[in-house]
Structures are given as structure tokens and as C-alpha cells.
Amino acid sequence: MNQEVIAKRYASALFQIALEQGQLDRIEEDVRAVRQALAENGEFLSLLSYPKLSLDQKKALIREAFAGVSTPVQNTLLLLLERHRFGLVPELAGTVSRPRSTTARGIAKAVAYSGAASTDEELRALSDVFAQKVGKQTLEIENIIDPELIGGVNVRIGNRIYDGSVSGQLERIRRQLIG
């Protein structure tokens, strides 16, 4: 089975535990810390794959090295070790990430295309209006300037586009007059 698929399964399970226990921020932070610690200390991974160390010794090393992380993260690390999949930790850490947690918190990403730069107040107003439309608590809006827009704003949320541009309104009027 593909390593990425396996890592996603473990990440998904860890994410569900984080949601159930209300520890999403803590577990996200812990997973990032584990990832960084392993990236900075490559010898640790080599030590865990050393055949002369028993499984209990390796578990003790993990418990000692990651004593400060939450129990679900520590248990996931131990489970990966038992199943000879500890090498998946960096990939697992990449999958327990912002997109999934922002969705769980009711945050969606959006892009607002406008003819000129929008103010923070305008972006906040757009966020409030469109968050309700898509059933989210808030939107993280990125403003992209499109010089072809005469006026108004086009907002893209996921694969949906809301056309509030002047040219879009003129096109709708033209269609009504013709049809």
C-alpha cells in the first residue's frame, strides 16, 4: 500500500481523536514539534531502526524524547513504532495540517478578485456575508487585484464563484433583455 495513503489513515484517526477530545490546537502543535524534532535529529530515526534495541527500549526512548507531547500523539508514535511504520511520522505530520483543522473550526478559504486593493474593512464585510452563504463561521479571504475588472468583486470559495463584478451584472442584464 502507498505510504502516503497509510500516513493519511493514521493522521485521520489522530485528527478524529483531537476533535473528540477538543484538543485540536494542542495536537496540531505537538505533531509539528515532533516533526521538527525528527527533522533536526535524523540520528533518532536511525536509532529506532537499530535491530539490537528491543521494542521496549525503543518505546522507552520515544516516551522519554516526547514526554511533553499529548497522550494521543505519544500513543500514535508508539503504535507506529510497534507496526514498523515510524518512518511515516514526517508524512503523518504533514497530513495533520491546517486545511483539515480550519474546516473543523468552521473556517473556509476564499479569494476575492477586485479591480483595486480592498480595505480590511471591505474584506471583513465580504467575509461576514459569504461565510453565512456557505455555512461557515468565517472566511480567510485573499485579495487578488484583477485589472480587467471595471468594478465590483468576484469571490471564489472552493470551486464556486460569486460574480459581483460590473461586467457580470451587465451580462446578466443583457441576457434578460434578449431572452
From Swiss-Prot:
It is found in: Cell membrane. It comes from Bacillus sp. (strain PS3). Pfam families: OSCP (PF00213). The keyword Cell membrane applies. The lineage of its organism: Bacteria, Bacillati, Bacillota, Bacilli, Bacillales. Belongs to the ATPase delta chain family. F(1)F(0) ATP synthase produces ATP from ADP in the presence of a proton or sodium gradient. F-type ATPases consist of two structural domains, F(1) containing the extramembraneous catalytic core and F(0) containing the membrane proton channel, linked together by a central stalk and a peripheral stalk. During catalysis, ATP synthesis in the catalytic domain of F(1) is coupled via a rotary mechanism of the central stalk subunits to proton translocation. This protein is part of the stalk that links CF(0) to CF(1). It either transmits conformational changes from CF(0) to CF(1) or is implicated in proton conduction. One of its GO terms (molecular function) is proton-transporting ATP synthase activity, rotational mechanism. This is ATP synthase subunit delta. One of its GO terms (cellular component) is plasma membrane. It is a peripheral membrane protein. Keywords: ATP synthesis, Cell membrane, CF(1), Hydrogen ion transport, Ion transport, Membrane, Transport. Gene3D superfamilies: N-terminal domain of the delta subunit of the F1F0-ATP synthase. InterPro entries: ATP_synth_OSCP/delta_N_sf, ATPase_OSCP/d_CS, ATPase_OSCP/dsu. F-type ATPases have 2 components, F(1) - the catalytic core - and F(0) - the membrane proton channel. F(1) has five subunits: alpha(3), beta(3), gamma(1), delta(1), epsilon(1). F(0) has three main subunits: a(1), b(2) and c(10-14). The alpha and beta chains form an alternating ring which encloses part of the gamma chain. F(1) is attached to F(0) by a central stalk formed by the gamma and epsilon chains, while a peripheral stalk is formed by the delta and b chains. PANTHER family: ATP SYNTHASE DELTA CHAIN.
